[in-house]
Amino acid sequence: MPYEANVTDVAYRYDGSFAGFLCCVFESYARHEIPSEVCSPEEGQLNLFGTREILTDRQRAKRVAVGLDRLGPQVKDRIVTGFLSTDPGKDLTLLRFARRCFAQGPQAVQMLGDPDVAAAFAIERAVNNEAGKFIEFIRFEERDGMLGTVIHPKHQVCLLYTSDAADD
């Protein structure tokens, strides 16, 4: 692991928001540690060891977001899109990916031989593939003057459709 961090037994617990996740990245960087898990309230405590509650601090989240902007759109998009996944463990995977990119720069996004980068790429691809599937096959019907449809996505892909709808 080329970045300076110790893998610890402690799990990070945060509020489930994207800003909260960015605060987990900040905490990991500040403490020079990689947690054993990063869990949101829906997941509960998954390990027997200590849990550190990470409070959402907008200033810290903004600092990490600015850092992601500096790394370029590929890195930021991979983390933002990956965050929409509902796969267990995605938070830790994305945290490790962010740490790798902060340590090695924007070129780290292309290092698919690295397990952290490959796992983040797989998460992003799964979300984008599902979003593409739904955008191609979704059919709306009219009821009482409103258009609607019922879908059951695995990931939180509906957020990706808002920019598509605004462009039309």
Give the residues covered by each predicted segment.
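Conserved small/polar residues in nucleotide/adenosyl-binding loops
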Residues: 161-168
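Charged, alpha-helical interface segments at or near domain boundaries
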Residues: 51-131
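Short, flexible loop/turn elements at secondary-structure junctions
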Residues: 16-18, 142, 153-155
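Flexible, glycine/proline-enriched loop segments at strand-loop-helix junctions
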Residues: 111-114, 148-152
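N-terminal ordered "arm"
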Residues: 2-58
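Short helix/loop capping segments that flank catalytic or ligand/cofactor-binding pockets
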Residues: 22-23, 158-160
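Extended, Lys/Arg-enriched charged tracts that mediate electrostatic binding to polyanionic substrates
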Residues: 150-152, 156, 163
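Type-3 copper protein
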Residues: 128-148, 162
